[in-house]
């Protein structure tokens, strides 16, 4: 008999020879049709068909958990691979991972050996996938030696699989299959193909094998999968709605920003976009001031010795830009924290002045492959709303709780009301002591629990220097965006020998907290554009008011109104072009101005304004002072 301990600490006994599926059907029947895999002791993830072989803490993974979701999507990638090879007998499969960001949730890179495949072929491939689902094949697993695996895939002409096997350090590999078809995979997978009922192929592109342009060009097919048609339909609606809201399209229409061939991945902010950018920065700056943050600025270019000292050289080298100055190596900063730590180290510190909260709108540069650049969402230069807090260890929990409150205050200001929060734990490639990681992770959990905030766990997805809280905001069409983070860092204070003098006169090491709320201003602005569909609330809108003249006779009156609104602190544009008023209105609607003032002779004679709110066709006649008062009230209440 074996003992399995559930998350609620209850212990269940399992007979020898039972599979995890048997266990769930007997002890947790309400999960029978939802279970996709199990996780043992917070680490090992297994198929339901595996036999129980030891005492363990067990979690049942469903689609609603990230690891269950990943299992589902990866199984759908296998479904795609099987369908493709059923239809294209010479096709060679390479890799089919799950992805968080992209035109799908999974993809498979395929060498079609000369066959041309386009989106027009998707219905045919999807029909074959449907057949496999209806057949409801049990998913089987087999462990073989590397030698056996190589011989098997050699017979099939699968050269990419052989190359992958050669790079696997262990002497055994696992193979997963459905019916007679199989693929190299470490798993886990769903129990049977019939579970994968609702899917859609979403995009196609080219990709080099191993992202090396000297290797073969492959065809990358993307897809998504859901447990139900309702969820798939909802997702497809989101995609169609997202196309209308694409920040690249709206940004061009509103003349907010552009990208130039002279600087791919480097945003150019136009006057209207700069207004928006500055509005976000000024708001957060004012909120930081209320909370005792001190703003700093650090250099963009710093010695490579600094990056070696901080650990970024070893952990981030491939994403950095380098230059030579006076025959020494320098780098554009990919992160702001080392420079901030130099400022901390510049002075002696007493426990009386801690916690010390530094804030920086720091511009950073990170090298991204050209193929992954995507508007403001994936760029090579961006500005982080960074904060670095240095505190005694016993202040860690209270500081984290204050940051949690701060973060939600900011998000609610922008109209976000639904959130998902995660704790990302220690990755394989990390620095620091085990006890520090355990303490920091425990503190993050306790902070969220005391605030009554539910959270999920992202195993192994923390930063190399410490665990973190990730804040995800849900936008107006139901998409989740990961934005803010709170990261605990014991490593950098150690590396930079940071200290403070405690009440007993002894030197102590502070803990360092990295905090960002927007994440990056560029990406957050992209999210806001799509969330609001460019229809920004008045307080941040770059196009608050547009004044449109009906005839030339009212030009002087319009200029007088324009000057009064400018003097009152509003963002206003004056359109006195010799165009029909209908054309001017259409242009203003495209610019998504909050208010249109349509001024004709009647308004001039009565010293009033014909006001049209965004999204409405009716106009209201207001006095000039009444309109200004309304605007001021609207901004105050936002």
From Swiss-Prot:
The residue stretches assigned to a coiled coil in this entry are none
Which top-level enzyme class is recorded in the Swiss-Prot or TrEMBL entry? Answer: ligase
UniProt cofactor(s): Zn(2+)
Establish whether keyword Ligase is in the entry.
yes
Q: How is the cofactor bound?
A: Binds 1 zinc ion per subunit.
The protein's annotated catalytic reaction(s) are: tRNA(Thr) + L-threonine + ATP = L-threonyl-tRNA(Thr) + AMP + diphosphate + H(+)
The record's listing under CDD domains reads:
TGS_ThrRS, ThrRS_anticodon, ThrRS_core
Q: Which InterPro entries match?
A: aa-tRNA-synt_IIb, aa-tRNA-synth_II, aa-tRNA-synth_II/BPL/LPL, Anticodon-bd, Anticodon-bd_dom_sf, Beta-grasp_dom_sf, TGS, TGS-like
Output the Gene Ontology terms for molecular function: ATP binding; metal ion binding; threonine-tRNA ligase activity; tRNA binding
| Domain of life of the native organism | Bacteria
Compartment annotation: Cytoplasm
PANTHER family the record matches: THREONINE--TRNA LIGASE, CHLOROPLASTIC_MITOCHONDRIAL 2, THREONINE-TRNA LIGASE
Q: Which family does it belong to?
A: Belongs to the class-II aminoacyl-tRNA synthetase family.
Designated name of the protein: Threonine--tRNA ligase
């Amino acid at each position: 008999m074996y003992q399995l301990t559930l998350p609620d600490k209850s212990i269940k006994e399992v007979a020898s020879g039972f599979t995890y599926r048997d266990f769930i059907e007997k002890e947790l029947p309400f999960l029978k049709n939802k279970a996709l895999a199990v996780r043992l002791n917070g680490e090992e993830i297994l198929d339901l068909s595996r036999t129980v072989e030891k005492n363990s803490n067990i979690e049942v993974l469903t689609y609603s958990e990230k690891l269950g979701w990943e299992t589902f999507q990866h199984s759908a990638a296998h479904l795609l691979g099987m369908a493709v090879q059923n239809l294209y007998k010479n096709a060679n499969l390479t890799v089919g991972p799950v992805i968080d960001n992209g035109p799908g949730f999974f993809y498979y890179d395929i060498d079609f050996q000369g066959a041309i495949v386009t989106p027009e072929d998707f219905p045919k491939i999807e029909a074959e996938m449907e057949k496999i689902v209806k057949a409801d094949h049990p998913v089987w697993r087999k462990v073989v030696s590397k030698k056996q695996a190589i011989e098997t895939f050699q017979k099939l002409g699968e050269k990419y699989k052989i190359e992958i096997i050669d790079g696997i350090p262990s002497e055994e590999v696992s193979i997963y299959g459905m019916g007679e078809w199989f693929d190299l995979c470490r798993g886990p997978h769903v129990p049977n193909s019939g579970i994968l009922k609702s899917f859609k192929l979403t995009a196609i592109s080219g990709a080099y094998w191993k992202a090396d342009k000297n290797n073969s060009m492959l065809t990358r097919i993307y897809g998504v999968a859901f447990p139900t048609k309702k969820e798939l339909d909802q997702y497809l609606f989101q995609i169609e709605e997202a196309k209308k809201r694409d920040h690249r399209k709206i940004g061009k229409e509103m003349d907010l920003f552009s990208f130039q061939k002279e600087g791919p991945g480097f945003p150019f902010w136009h006057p209207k976009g700069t207004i928006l950018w500055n509005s976000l920065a000024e708001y957060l700056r004012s909120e930081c001031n209320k909370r005792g943050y001190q703003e700093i600025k650090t250099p963009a270019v710093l010695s490579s010795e600094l990056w070696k000292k901080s650990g970024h050289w070893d952990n981030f080298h491939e994403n950095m830009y380098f230059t030579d100055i006076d025959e020494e190596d320098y780098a554009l900063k990919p992160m702001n924290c080392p420079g901030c730590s130099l400022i901390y180290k510049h002075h002696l510190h007493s426990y009386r002045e801690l916690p010390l909260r530094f804030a920086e709108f720091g511009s950073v540069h990170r090298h991204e492959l050209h193929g992954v650049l995507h508007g403001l969402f994936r760029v090579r230069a961006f500005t982080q709303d960074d904060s670095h807090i240095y505190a005694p260890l016993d202040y860690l929990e209270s500081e984290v709780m204050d940051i949690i409150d701060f973060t939600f205050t900011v998000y609610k200001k922008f109209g976000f009301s639904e959130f998902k929060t995660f704790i990302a734990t220690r990755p394989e490639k990390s620095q620091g002591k085990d006890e520090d990681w355990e303490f920091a992770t425990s503190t993050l959990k306790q902070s969220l629990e005391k605030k009554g905030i539910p959270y999920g766990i992202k195993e192994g997805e923390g930063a190399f220097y410490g665990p973190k809280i990730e804040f995800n905001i849900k936008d107006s069409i139901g998409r989740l965006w990961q934005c803010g983070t709170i990261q605990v860092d014991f490593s950098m204070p150690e590396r930079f020998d940071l200290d403070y003098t405690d009440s007993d006169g002894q030197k102590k090491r502070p803990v360092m907290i990295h905090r960002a709320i927007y994440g990056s201003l560029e990406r957050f602005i992209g999210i806001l554009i799509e969330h609001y569909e460019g229809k920004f609330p008045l307080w941040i809108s770059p196009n608050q008011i547009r004044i449109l003249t009906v005839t030339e006779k009212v030009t002087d009156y319009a200029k007088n109104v324009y000057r009064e609104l400018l003097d009152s602190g509003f963002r206003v544009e004056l359109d006195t072009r010799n165009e029909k008023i209908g054309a001017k209105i259409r242009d203003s609607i495209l610019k998504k101005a909050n208010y249109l003032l349509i001024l004709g002779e009647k308004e001039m004679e009565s010293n009033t304004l014909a006001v049209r709110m965004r999204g409405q066709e009716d106009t209201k006649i207001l006095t000039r002072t009444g309109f200004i008062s309304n605007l001021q009230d609207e901004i105050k209440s936002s």
